[in-house]
Amino acid sequence: MSKTRDLLAALVIRLTFVVALFAAVLMPAAAQSTDAELKLLVDALAARGFSETEDAIKALAFTGDDRVAAVLGALGEGNLFVGKTSKQVVIGRAAGRDLVLTDPVTRAEIGTEPSAAYTKIRVNNRLRRTIQAAIGTLTLLSDNPVTRRAAAEAVMKTRDPETIPALDAAIAEETDAGILQVMQEARAAAVLNSDAAEADKVAAIATIAGRGDRESLSILTQYIAAPGEVGVAAQAAVDDVNTTIALWNAGQNIWFGVSLGSVLLLAAIGLAITFGVMGVINMAHGEMVMIGAYTTFVVQQQIRMYAPGLFDFSLLIALPLAFLVAGAIGVAIERGVIRFLYGRPLETLLATWGISLILQQAVRSRFGAQNQQVGNPSWMSGSFDVGLISITYSRLWIVVFAIFVFFALMALLKRTPFGLQTRAVTANRQMASAMGIRTPWIDAMTFGLGSGVAGIAGVALSQIENVSPNLGQGYIIDSFMVVVFGGVGNLWGTLVGALTLGIANKFLEPYAGAVLGKIFVLVFIILFIQKRPRGLFALKGRSIEA
Amino acid sequence: MSSNGTIRKFTTGALAGMLAATALMTAGSALAQEETIKVGILHSLSGTMAISETTLKDVMLMLIEQQNEKGGLLGKKLEAVVVDPASDWPLFAEKARELISQNGVAAVFGCWTSVSRKSVLPVFEELNSVLFYPVQYEGEESQRNVFYTGAAPNQQAIPAVDYLEAEEGVERWVLAGTDYVYPRTTNKILEAYLLAKGVAPEDIMINYTPFGHSDWQTIVSDIKAFGSAGKKTAVVSTINGDANVPFYKELGNQGIKAEDIPVVAFSVGEEELAGIDTTPLVGHLAAWNYFQSVEDPINDEFIAAWKAYKGKDTAVTNDPMEAHYIGFNMWVKAVEAAGTTDSDAVIDALVGVAVPNLSGGYSSMGPNHHITKPVLIGEIQDDGQFEIVSQTPGLVLGDEWSDYLEGSKDLISDWRKPLACGNFNVVTGKCGGAS
């Protein structure tokens, strides 16, 4: 029985191909199919292999029926199911262990059934491409401009000469200049792929070259070897596009460098206080960053559980908490261990390294060794394009945030009584003490401040990094590098150092590769420190020299 | 003076107490030794590899517990001995020695990275014990004391490349990996394979990054640039461990969709995906010999047992866990067949043993100490699971010496008597490695 069904479906697909081809030629405005015809075609989507499903998709698209786009959309999103016994294809929406079913043809709700009775129709990348192309052709005349633009982009990827009539129809109707251009580019791509006249193709090359991006490069490269005018024009266009891209690449490297620099700055700025200002070699600094990231995780977990609506604010809530948690741990470390070790750098190094291991293992025992999922709030997901550079929101916000933290810290140290006392203790401890400053208290608070800042850096880094117990380890070397390079005890040095290293790294990486690039940067720093042991911006003063 | 006396008295008392305790403990362990068969578990529970290896320790504990519920082995209970080599490669060798000579374990299940395996090899050879290694690796090795239950390159990398070529029409390849022995060897094999298939050298881009690399902006944009040469491009990723998460995040951020440039990964499984929002990654691929989404009653049972064991409904299973499942059952069967846990007898009995795997077939141990497995290709779904899009019709036996590398293509391994050689050269007819 089911075999005959399959056969019948296959036959219908073949027939529809033929009929649809005629239809496409004879009457561009697609006719509506009857429910029964459409149903047969839809049921054929549940074929055994990907190739058969692909045929079924094409057959469905050929009908030009306006109900098809929704069915194919559901298929692409994995919402199309086939009954295990009924062999009927339905649109399903998961609701717990059940599926809420809709009829793909009539759009009527069928009811709710256990998902165990249905199998999802599988799609792979090839099918997803076919689906997008099919939906693209079907929705070129949609009322929604966003859909139309997406449709034009999808059609452009197919470069299928058969889409030219549909594109022509759409171009005639289109009013939006931006979408019109995409449609014309899509048409040009299709023309290049067809057996059109040479002059048409040369014009098409000019249209595509106008995009000046990678997509156009990818299309044009294929025609370099074409005979006659077309090949020459394509070669010239490819050279032009390459020049444009090279320029944008330099800009992109600067942006990547600034973005890496801001990450380095965030990671190092807390250390600039504990190591730079206080002179404590704090190997547990990275773990403060890690604790900040875990605080974000816990905050998000609680929000997901109790107030999912607040998710977009989770980072703002996590910021003060991370500062407090990491700061409190910092104060505890200072009071419990480091204050007994002032003036003994080697012991401080070993003790703080031990603390870093303890903190790592404590987090591992409490949260497990696995990465924790820290979500991006909606305002930090996705990207936008500036020319050919795609700027991701998360990186952009981190740059902004790093600069904000930098200036806030600067103000705190330069404009507040606490900052004044801190600088006094750093400059001359005895004298500060004689002036009535409680130096132990200042020590604890300054260390707490440095740790707290590391904590809020962790909140930001949780957005681009793995939140795992090892998070901090990756940053400790980089942080020391930045602080030493920039000049111990100088916040400006940290800023300049971080940005310099970030940009240098990103300009080296394309040529030297990630591994060698990093080595070059290290070698450069070693040489630099030989020449200027106090870094870029050396502090001058009596106590510093001592 | 009196305080001195108290101290001395206290010391004597304590010493006597400690002696007694030691005596008791020795007696206790002697007693235990008669009753149990010890199984060593050598997985990092701290350090960078803990992320992957901790679950393997847990799955071994669960398997041992299940076996004990079934009545143990040879009438004795199994006892797990867990040590922590802390992701420190030389420590693996020390801990292996401790397991074998001090604890007297009958077999060891462990290691993840190739470098940790290489570091314990001499120990297993010297002390003649048995190691089950559950992770996909680069091949080019066959040791008498080691049983490789993970995939060799021909069980993972090569079928994945074939799939991309046939199904996606890929003509341009980015081989991206972490900078250490597994990716470097695998990429060498893949490069030789692709060149042999007629791919032009300029259509292959090879890129290495350090462990834990987190800033992928440049590399992802390089991949994008490489992919805009008009030919369908794919990325074959041997990126290992933590670095995967920021890599996939960056792919999503820069808008590289699986439909445009698919990424097929050999080291990304359910466990690694647990840390990311997979919505932007739908359609990227992974090649393994097992996925949690395999539809099979034995697999359902295994997943249910695992979730119950972890007490967490969100616990996931992955390929190396299945490898331990297969390896442990093979060892149990071989011990039963040999009637003893003696290494020599078990090593001989293991060749040819077949046990059910979790994807509905039977895996058997080949004479080269590698096993037969199906090769599955899966696409990442938005729930962090894999949708299987391709499966080899039969099982594939691991090929330890790659056919595509100079120097290893003439080698075979057969540990059965009379050959009993891990690197027999079929051209020179000699046992002893590369010609």
What are these regions (language model features)?
Chain B
Residues 40-59, 83-90, 112-115, 179-184, ...:
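Extracytoplasmic "Venus flytrap"
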Residues 27-29:
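N-terminal signal peptide c-region/cleavage motif recognized by signal peptidases
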Residues 94, 138-139, 145-254, 293-301, ...:
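Extracellular/periplasmic Venus flytrap/periplasmic-binding protein
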Residues 250-325, 335-341, 392-423, 427-428:
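Extracellular/periplasmic periplasmic-binding protein-like sensory domains
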Residues 51-58, 66, 71-140, 149, ...:
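Beta-alpha junction/loop-to-helix N-cap segments that form part of ligand/metal-binding clefts
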Residues 2-17:
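Bacterial N-terminal signal peptides that target proteins for export
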Residues 99-111, 132-134, 172-177, 230-241, ...:
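Periplasmic-binding protein-like
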Residues 37, 354-435:
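Solvent-exposed, acidic/polar segments of extracytosolic/periplasmic ligand-binding ectodomains
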